[in-house]
């Protein structure tokens, strides 16, 4: 729509990185990387495909129900590789099944990044600083 929007996403890939996912496992430049911040989501995805988590939104429930993995590319592939261009960053939201991020809109230039999250206020049971 041409409007500027502010979003909060996690930087997954730095300029020049090769990011690869295989069935919810992240590899950065070929090195297996732990995404401990996703543990709660991954557990719930394996338990009930996030149906309770998304009980407030039937569309989100249907997306999760059809998903083969928690982290997929924009086409639903569970294994994919992204080459991060020089001077750009790969950003992903933690709620991967419904997040609009670099998988849909591409990488972000450094000039588009404005800050660093210091406080979490959602979910309510995890309010706190980083």
Give the positions of each predicted feature.
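Soluble "head" domains of membrane/secretory-pathway proteins
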Residues: 1-130
């Amino acid at each position: 729509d041409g409007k500027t929007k502010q979003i909060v996403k996690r930087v997954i890939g730095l300029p020049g990185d090769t990011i690869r996912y295989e069935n919810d496992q992240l590899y950065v430049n070929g090195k297996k990387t732990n995404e401990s911040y996703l543990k709660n989501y991954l557990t719930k995805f394996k338990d009930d495909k996030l149906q309770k988590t998304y009980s407030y939104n039937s569309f989100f429930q249907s997306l999760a129900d059809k998903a083969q993995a928690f982290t997929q590319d924009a086409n639903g592939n569970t294994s994919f590789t992204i080459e991060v261009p020089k001077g750009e960053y790969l950003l992903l939201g933690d709620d991967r099944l419904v997040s609009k991020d670099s998988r849909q809109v591409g990488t972000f230039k450094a000039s588009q990044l404005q800050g660093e999250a210091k406080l979490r206020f959602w979910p309510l049971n995890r309010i706190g600083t980083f």
